[in-house]
UniProtKB/Swiss-Prot annotation:
Chief localisation class: cytoplasm
Pfam (any one): LisH_PAC1
GO CC terms of this entry: axon; axon cytoplasm; cell cortex; centrosome; cytoplasmic microtubule; dendrite; dynactin complex; dynein complex
Name of the featured protein: Lissencephaly-1 homolog
Lineage of origin: Eukaryota, Metazoa, Ecdysozoa, Arthropoda, Hexapoda
WD repeat residue intervals: 106-147, 148-187, 191-230, 233-272, 275-334, 337-376, 379-411
Described function: Positively regulates the activity of the minus-end directed microtubule motor protein dynein. May enhance dynein-mediated microtubule sliding by targeting dynein to the microtubule plus end. Required for several dynein- and microtubule-dependent processes such as nuclear migration during cell division, mitotic spindle formation and the removal of mitotic checkpoint proteins from kinetochores at the metaphase to anaphase transition.
Family designation: Belongs to the WD repeat LIS1/nudF family.
GO biological process: axo-dendritic transport; axonal transport; border follicle cell migration; brain morphogenesis; centrosome localization; centrosome separation; chorion-containing eggshell pattern formation; clathrin-dependent endocytosis involved in vitellogenesis
Gene3D superfamilies per UniProt: 1.20.960.30, YVTN repeat-like/Quinoprotein amine dehydrogenase
Keywords for the protein's UniProt record, in alphabetical order: Cell cycle, Cell division, Centromere, Chromosome, Coiled coil, Cytoplasm, Cytoskeleton, Developmental protein, Differentiation, Kinetochore, Microtubule, Mitosis, Neurogenesis, Oogenesis, Repeat, Transport, WD repeat
Subcellular location: Cytoplasm, Cytoskeleton; Cytoplasm, Cytoskeleton, Microtubule organizing center, Centrosome; Cytoplasm, Cytoskeleton, Spindle pole; Chromosome, Centromere, Kinetochore
Molecular function via GO: dynein complex binding; microtubule plus-end binding
UniProt comment concerning the protein's domains: Dimerization mediated by the LisH domain may be required to activate dynein.
Length: 411
């Protein structure tokens, strides 16, 4: 195959080759090449390292081309799958599909958490820029910002009615915000000795739980703002706390590679779950609707009969997702496929699927019954840090280090 280079391009290439040979000590080859290519003894400065630069940029371009080809294949598949069919999918089978409905910008640093409001068509994003933003997920409009934290906001949570919002931050505080009228901070709680990484309401709404890098979990009374309990046991940074819908138990995960399930009313750890091989970043309780799919998936692996649950999913820096029966402390299944840390998990309200967000920049949809990844969305330009699935409307939201919040429609 004949290369079509202009005279000037040929001369520049020869100079770059001469520089490469000279700088890597190929003196004899350089001498021969100079004679044959009719080059002067001095190579111009601008050709220094040029050959290596061109080589690495070609490799980068090839990688980009492969990524774009994968996205194109995905989009073509989407057109076929998204087209009207005789067998209409029921809402219980709807999953997020590209492209995103909205890509929302405004935060000036990484997004740390995204959550839906339990009642209104609103969602909330927390960011390392120390602010919380409120958006309308149906229109994509920005509503307002909540300002008060002085460092990265790590997590946000609503009470069951969506009247109160709790937030926690690397500034060591937990704040409660009036989400009905004033949108002002009504309480600030201090007590942790390090970064507060996660926050969650107990379902009745009278208590808030917080998890921290100081290795403890604390329970706070909403009415007074007092710390009423401290749970200890994790050996390293506690990354996330999530309360079971019944409120009698809650789960935490940690850099110590374990998940602990605690009794809310005492300080006792009910069970410690160990199987992950790296920091456990995120956890999510499975809805009751997921029990049959999880049992069917687990049935192939063990013959111990029906699992009662409750079931908990965990995502780790070991790139896997595990699903546990916490009543017996058993890992029932492992989902592998992400190429980087798993940072966020959310169950489909219909119970058939689990969605995950990862540092590999994708969102994956997992078919629980068949223990397989059934869809990969190339979601963000940088790490995906958080994901939420709406309980009643066909929407998924995701947040990323690329400073965007994305809204995905399910169909």
């Amino acid at each position: 195959m004949k290369m079509v280079l202009s005279q000037r391009q040929r001369e520049e290439l020869n100079q770059a080759i001469a520089d490469y040979l000279g700088s890597n000590g190929y003196a004899d080859s350089l001498e021969t090449f100079r004679k044959e290519a009719d080059l002067s003894t001095e190579v111009e400065k601008k050709f220094g390292g040029l050959l290596e630069k061109k080589w690495t940029s070609v490799i980068r371009l090839q990688k980009k081309v492969m990524e774009l080809e994968a996205k194109l294949t995905e989009a073509e598949k989407e057109v076929i799958e998204g087209a009207p069919t005789k067998n209409k999918r029921t809402p219980g089978e709807w999953i997020p599909r590209p492209p995103e409905k909205f890509s929302l910008t405004g935060h000036r640093a990484s997004i740390t958490r995204v959550i839906f409001h339990p009642i209104f068509a609103l969602m909330v994003s927390a960011s390392e820029d120390a602010t919380i933003r409120i958006w309308d997920f149906e229109t994509g409009e920005y509503e307002r910002s909540l300002k008060g934290h002085t460092d990265s906001v790590q997590d946000v949570a609503f009470d069951a009615q969506g009247k109160l919002l709790a937030s926690c931050s690397a500034d060591l505080s937990i704040k409660l915000w009036d989400f009905q009228q004033s949108y002002e901070c009504i309480k600030t709680m201090h007590g942790h000795d390090h970064n507060v990484s996660s926050v969650a309401f107990v379902p009745a709404g009278d208590y808030v739980l917080s998890a921290s890098r100081d290795r403890t979990i604390k329970m706070w009374e909403v009415a007074t703002g007092y710390c009423v309990k401290t749970y200890t046991g994790h050996r390293e940074w506690v990354r996330m706390v999530r309360v079971h819908i019944e409120g009698s138990i809650f789960a935490t995960c940690s850099n110590d590679q374990t998940i602990r399930v605690w009794l809310t009313n005492s300080k006792d750890c009910k069970v410690e779950l160990r199987d992950h091989e790296h920091t456990v970043e995120c956890i999510a309780w499975a809805p009751e609707a997921a029990a049959s799919a999880i049992n069917e998936a687990a049935g192939a692996d063990n013959k111990k009969g029906h699992h009662q649950g409750p079931f908990l999913a965990s995502g780790s820096r070991d790139k896997t997702i595990r699903i546990w029966d916490v009543s017996v402390g058993l890992c029932l299944l492992t989902l592998s496929g992400h190429d980087n840390w798993v940072r966020g998990l959310a169950f489909h309200p219909g119970g058939k699927y689990l969605v995950s967000a990862s540092d590999d920049k994708t969102i994956r949809v997992w078919d629980l019954r068949n223990k397989r990844c059934m869809k990969t969305l190339y979601a963000h330009q940088h790490f995906c840090t958080s994901i939420d699935f709406h309980k009643a409307h066909p929407y998924v939201i995701s947040g990323s280090v690329d400073q965007t919040v994305k809204v995905w429609e399910c169909r």
